[in-house]
C-alpha cells in the first residue's frame, strides 16, 4: 500500500554531549537543508551510553522553535515516566504557541526493567513498571493530555488525577500525538489512540509496518521510522521499496559532534526529490 508519493525526511538531534549552541546550529542547518522536522530525545543523562550530559528537551525545543520558521518541532519521544501528563500538556501547549503551530508530541512509555535506560529512572526514584502497566499508563497519559488541551478541568484514572479548577491554557489547536513503538502492542495502541506512530528500525520493522497497513482506519494517521543516520551514505541510509511505500516520514538520528556538512549534503540529496 502506498501511503504517499514521497517520504518526508526529519532529523532527531541527540542531546548527549552536545551544547545548546551546537543543537541550535544543527537545527538551523537541518531546516536550511530541507528537512521537515527537528526533534530531540527526552533523557536526563547520557551516562548509560557513556555520552556524558544530556539537555532538557523542552528548553531546547523552545529555543529551536525560536530560531526556525518552517520545521516541525517536538520530543521524540517524551518519556511518560519523567513527568505528570498535565505538566507535559502545558509544556506542549507553550511549544505549540511559541512555534506558531509547528509542535508535535512524540510519546513513549518509559524504560523497561533491565533495559539500558532503566538506571535513569532508578536514579531519581521513579518506579520501573512491567510492560502491561506501562501500556495502560501510556494510554491514560494520552487521554489526560488531550483532556487538558480541551480545557476539561477534572480527571481521575488508575495512575493520574487532576482536580478543579483545572488548568488554563492558551492553545488554539492541539499538536498531533505520535507514539514511539518497537513492538506490536504499542503500534496497536497508537493506531487506536494517537495520530501516528514512530517505529524503531530493526528486524521487526516490516512486520510492524504491515500491522499499521492492515489496521489503520484514518487516512490522516502518520507512519514514520526512526533510523540512525549513515554519514557515509549519500542519502543517509537505505529504504527498501516496500518500506518506502508504507512510510510517510523517515527520521534520521544525528549525534554530537554534529557533522553539519554531511547533514547538508544528505538533506540536499534527499529533499530535492
Q: Which sequence ranges carry the predicted segments?
A:
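Active-site-adjacent structural elements that line small-molecule/cofactor binding pockets in enzymes
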Residues: 1-273
Amino acid at each position: 500500500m502506498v501511503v504517499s508519493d514521497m517520504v518526508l525526511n526529519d532529523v532527531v538531534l541527540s542531546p548527549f554531549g552536545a551544547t545548546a549552541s551546537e543543537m541550535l546550529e544543527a537545527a538551523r542547518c537541518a531546516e536550511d537543508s530541507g528537512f521537515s522536522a527537528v526533534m530531540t530525545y527526552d533523557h536526563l543523562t547520557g551516562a548509560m551510553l557513556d555520552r556524558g550530559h544530556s539537555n532538557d528537551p523542552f528548553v531546547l525545543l523552545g529555543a529551536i522553535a525560536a530560531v526556525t520558521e518552517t520545521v516541525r518541532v517536538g520530543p521524540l519521544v517524551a518519556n511518560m515516566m519523567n513527568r505528570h501528563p498535565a505538566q507535559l500538556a502545558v509544556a506542549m501547549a507553550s511549544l505549540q504557541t511559541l512555534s506558531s503551530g509547528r509542535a508535535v508530541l512524540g510519546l513513549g512509555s518509559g524504560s523497561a526493567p533491565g533495559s539500558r535506560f532503566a538506571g535513569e529512572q532508578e536514579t531519581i526514584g521513579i518506579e520501573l513498571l512491567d510492560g502491561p502497566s506501562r501500556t495502560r499508563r501510556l494510554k491514560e497519559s494520552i487521554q489526560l493530555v488531550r483532556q487538558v488541551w480541551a480545557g476539561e478541568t477534572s480527571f481521575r484514572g488508575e495512575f493520574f488525577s487532576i482536580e478543579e479548577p483545572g488548568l488554563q491554557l492558551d492553545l488554539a489547536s492541539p499538536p498531533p500525538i505520535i507514539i514511539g513503538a518497537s513492538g506490536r502492542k504499542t503500534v496497536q495502541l497508537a493506531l487506536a489512540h494517537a495520530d501516528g506512530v514512530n517505529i524503531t528500525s530493526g528486524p521487526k520493522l516490516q512486520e510492524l509496518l504491515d500491522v499499521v497497513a492492515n489496521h489503520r482506519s484514518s487516512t490522516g494517521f502518520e507512519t514514520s521510522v526512526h533510523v540512525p543516520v549513515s554519514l557515509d551514505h549519500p542519502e543517509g541510509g537505505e529504504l527498501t521499496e516496500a518500506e518506502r511505500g508504507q512510510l510517510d516520514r523517515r527520521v534520521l538520528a544525528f549525534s554530537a559532534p554534529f557533522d553539519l556538512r554531511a547533514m547538508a549534503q544528505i538533506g540536499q540529496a534527499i529533499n530535492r526529490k
